[in-house]
Amino acid sequence: MKHYFVDTNVVIDMLADREGYADAACELFDAAGRGEVHLSICALSYSTIYYILRKYAGKENAISSLRDLTDYVSILPVDAEVIRKALYSEFSDYEDAIQHYAALQDASVEGIITRNIEDYRYSDIPVLLPTEFHK
């Protein structure tokens, strides 16, 4: 089974039902629910997702969505090493750098799924769009 790290924006696309992006994100998480792929996100993503979802759906719905999310993903830690590597990386987006180095901590991660391919141009592992995970 393929193992992918999912960028925060893709998770938010699904949970916030973002027009134009939600369908591909839902397909990815549906595949995880069927046991066809294994998905991971980093611990830091939870606070970002909560902050954004709370604005759309309120605190209770945001927390409920995050609880449900734990059924679909493994949560990778963000430790001092990840932070240091991200701070000194060539990534233009610091949050993406953190996610990248969190993903690298798990050798079984085969790719990062994001809508922002360009932000991961310095990635050490393959980067895919949400529509490409099943290819």
Regions found by a protein language model. Name each.
Residues 10, 16, 51, 96-102:
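Hydrophobic side chains within alpha-helical segments
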Residues 1-41, 54-61, 122, 128, ...:
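Short, well-structured N-terminal submotif of metal-dependent ribonuclease cores
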Residues 71, 123-124:
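Short, structured coil segments at secondary-structure junctions
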Residues 12, 47-49, 119-121:
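Short, active-site-adjacent cap segments at secondary-structure transitions
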Residues 9-10, 44, 81, 118:
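Alpha-helix/helix-capping structural signal
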Residues 74-117:
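Active-site neighborhoods of divalent-metal-dependent phosphate/nucleic-acid chemistry enzymes
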Residues 19, 26, 44-48, 52-74, ...:
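Active-site-proximal, substrate-binding regions of enzyme catalytic domains
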